Amino acid sequence: MDSITTAASVVAAGLAVGLGAIGPGIGQGSAAQGAVEGIARQPEAEGKIRGTLLLSFAFMESLTIYGLVVALVLLFANPFAG
Amino acid sequence: MLVFPLLQPENDSSKEDQRELETLGESSQSTESNLNLGPVMEASIASSDEYVQLQQRIFRAALLVSALAVAITAFFFESQVAISLLIGALSGVLYLRLLARSIGQLGTSSKSVSKIQLVVPVVLVLAVSKLSQLELLPALLGFLLYKPSLIFQILLESRSRASS
C-alpha cells in the first residue's frame, strides 16, 4: 500500500467515526434526557419508557456502528491496499 | 369613631381567615405525613418486570432469527461462512445485552448510558481481520441480525396499542 492510500485511509477512518458519531450522540443525549424526565414524573411507566429507549437506542447506535465498521475496515482490512 | 367599628369586623374576618389557613396547613401537613407511596412503588416494580420481559422477548427473537439464518447459510454456503455468521450473530446478541443493561442502569446507578457495548463490534472486526478462518461480510451481516427482532417487537407493540 503506497503512502497516499495509507494517509487517505487513515483520514477517511477518522472522518467516518467522527462525523458518524455526531448525530447519534446528540440524539441519544436528548432521548436519554427525555426518558429520565419521564421516569421521574411517572415512575409507574418506567418499564415502557425503558423499553422504548432500548429500541430507539439500538437503532440510533447502529449509525455509529456503521461508521465504526467502515473505519475499522479501512484500517485493518483495506480493500484498496493493492 | 365611625371608622373603627367598620374596621373591626374586617380584622375579625382576617383573623378567621388566618385560622382557616392555619388549619388547612395543618391538615395538608398531616396528609403529607400519612402519604402512602406503596402503590407507586408497586407500579414501578411491575413496570421494571415489564422491561425485563421485553428484554427476554427481544433476546429470544434474536436467537431464533440467528439460528434460522445460520441454518440457511450452512445449507446454501460453506461452513466457514456459516461460522462467521454465527460469531457475528452471537456478538450482536451480546451487544444488545450490554445495551439493555446500560439502559437499565440509567437513572438508578448511572447518569448516562455507557458506551461499553461499542467494544463488541470493534473486537468482532479486529478478530475477523486477524483470523483467516473468518470472513468479514458474513460476520457483519450476522452482527446486524438483532435488528429484525427489534423491528418485529416494534410492530407487535404498535399493533397491541392500536387494538387497545
From Swiss-Prot, chain A:
Keywords: ATP synthesis, CF(0), Hydrogen ion transport, Ion transport, Lipid-binding, Membrane, Thylakoid, Transmembrane, Transmembrane helix, Transport. Coiled coil: none annotated. GO terms for cellular component: plasma membrane-derived thylakoid membrane; proton-transporting ATP synthase complex; proton-transporting two-sector ATPase complex, proton-transporting domain. It holds the Pfam family ATP-synt_C. The keyword Thylakoid applies. The record marks 61 as: Reversibly protonated during proton transport. It is a multi-pass membrane protein. The chain crosses the membrane at residues 7-27, 57-77. It is found in: Cellular thylakoid membrane. GO terms for molecular function: lipid binding; proton-transporting ATP synthase activity, rotational mechanism. PROSITE patterns: ATPASE_C. F(1)F(0) ATP synthase produces ATP from ADP in the presence of a proton or sodium gradient. F-type ATPases consist of two structural domains, F(1) containing the extramembraneous catalytic core and F(0) containing the membrane proton channel, linked together by a central stalk and a peripheral stalk. During catalysis, ATP synthesis in the catalytic domain of F(1) is coupled via a rotary mechanism of the central stalk subunits to proton translocation. F-type ATPases have 2 components, F(1) - the catalytic core - and F(0) - the membrane proton channel. F(1) has five subunits: alpha(3), beta(3), gamma(1), delta(1), epsilon(1). F(0) has four main subunits: a(1), b(1), b'(1) and c(10-14). The alpha and beta chains form an alternating ring which encloses part of the gamma chain. F(1) is attached to F(0) by a central stalk formed by the gamma and epsilon chains, while a peripheral stalk is formed by the delta, b and b' chains. PANTHER family: ATP SYNTHASE LIPID-BINDING PROTEIN, MITOCHONDRIAL, ATPASE PROTEIN 9. Belongs to the ATPase C chain family. This is ATP synthase subunit c. It comes from Prochlorococcus marinus (strain MIT 9211). The gene is atpE.
